[in-house]
Swiss-Prot record:
GO terms for cellular component: extracellular region. The keyword Transmembrane helix does not apply. It is an enzyme of class 1 (oxidoreductase). One of its GO terms (biological process) is anther wall tapetum development. Disulfide bonds join C54-C134, C87-C92, C140-C342, C219-C251. The gene is PER9. It is found in: Secreted. The lineage of its organism: Eukaryota, Viridiplantae, Streptophyta, Embryophyta, Tracheophyta. Heme b binds at H212. It comes from Arabidopsis thaliana (Mouse-ear cress). This is Peroxidase 9. Pfam families: peroxidase. Substrate binds at P182. It catalyses: 2 a phenolic donor + H2O2 = 2 a phenolic radical donor + 2 H2O.
């Protein structure tokens, strides 16, 4: 009798004990439904995460990006940078998108981000369209990763197979944003240390710095190089002379801190390897660019020369390094949430 009573219970247990990776993507879980064989969605990101739960996700992202970048080519670099600044602070969790609230001190107000990071309205537009198509399925963290890849492609750069499945944080770290994002005047050792803390190596540092092949920087980030690089009221002697005088016309000794200069003066809206060629010619804009060549630590200088000579090599490593960066401490499984709106927690 006891056994016969137990049988229905066992049947129900078997019927409902299926792999949660095929669960419905709604209810804020954002689950995909095509987990790799032998893998687990708790610990792994994988490119097919939205194959069944939101197959049109990338198409939606690219449609918004095409319009935004056509309207303002600089936006591509802004979105690439937004992903970088997110991942270096408590992982790739979209914490950078959160606004101030009763419980959140926004990373947007940190020194490296304030009046600097941008592209939030593009992310919001992508999120709104994804919410219409696939409610509470695609995370803001994944939107940042998809937007970074799409921006690179639309600027003429490489594509890569992008692991997905990140979830969104319920917290932000203002202090982390102030201490974990490399400064534009960083030494080569500072850069290497900060990247190593995130599990990234020299190849990652140099290739990801190559993202500066697009975009601009404000005068305040490079003024020191022009007027007082070593505390002696003298310019950085590594600057090529004509480039130096051109920068002085953009960035006077006093005022003009928000004036901008392209990071790659030759092809500022095209993703190519010209950035590395310019470094060899003394035309890198930021100290953190120039020290990749002149820092005399490890093999960064050799990598600069290699990427300057071989654009394909740079593209291949950049793609690998973007995946590496995108894998920094993602929230997966039941950690975090899928935000309905990227700038507030649910």
């Amino acid at each position: 009798m006891a056994i016969s009573k137990l049988i229905p219970t066992l049947v129900l247990f078997v019927l409902f004990s299926f792999d949660v990776s095929v669960a419905h993507p709604g209810l804020g879980f954002g689950w995909g439904s095509n987990s790799p064989i032998g893998g687990s969605f708790y610990s792994n990101l994988y490119p097919q995460f939205y194959q069944f739960s939101c197959p049109q996700a990338d198409e939606i992202v690219m449609t918004v990006l095409e319009k935004a970048i056509a309207k303002e080519p600089r936006m591509a670099a802004s979105l690439l940078r937004l992903h970088f600044h997110d991942c270096f602070v408590q992982g790739c969790d979209a914490s950078i998108l959160l606004d101030d609230s009763a419980t959140i001190r926004s990373e947007k107000n940190a020194g490296p981000n304030k009046n600097s990071v941008r592209g939030f309205q593009v992310i919001d537009e992508i999120k709104a369209k994804l919410e219409q198509a696939c409610p509470q399925t695609v995370s803001c963290a994944d939107i940042l990763a998809l937007a970074a890849r799409g921006s690179t492609i639309l600027s003429g750069g490489p594509s890569w197979e992008l692991p997905l499945g990140r979830r969104d944080s319920r917290t932000a770290s203002l202090n982390g944003a102030n201490t974990n994002i490399p400064a534009p005047n960083s030494t080569i050792q500072n850069l290497l240390t900060m990247f190593q803390r995130k599990g990234l190596n020299e190849e990652d540092l140099v290739s990801l710095s190559g993202g500066h092949t697009i975009g601009v920087a404000r005068c305040t980030t490079f003024k020191q190089r022009l007027y007082n690089q070593n505390g002696n009221n003298q310019p950085d002697e590594t600057l090529e002379r004509s480039y130096y005088y051109g920068l002085r016309s953009i960035c006077p000794p006093t005022g003009g801190d928000n004036n901008i200069s392209p990071l790659d003066l030759a092809s500022p809206a095209r993703f190519d390897n010209t950035y590395f060629k310019l470094l060899l010619w003394g035309k890198g804009l930021l100290t953190s660019d120039e020290v990749l060549l002149t820092g005399n630590v490890g093999k960064t200088g050799a990598l600069v020369k290699a990427y300057a000579e071989d654009e394909r090599l740079f593209f291949q490593q950049f793609a690998k390094s973007m995946v590496n960066m995108g894998n920094i401490q993602p929230l997966t499984g039941f950690n975090g949430e899928i935000r309905k709106s990227c700038h507030v927690i649910n």
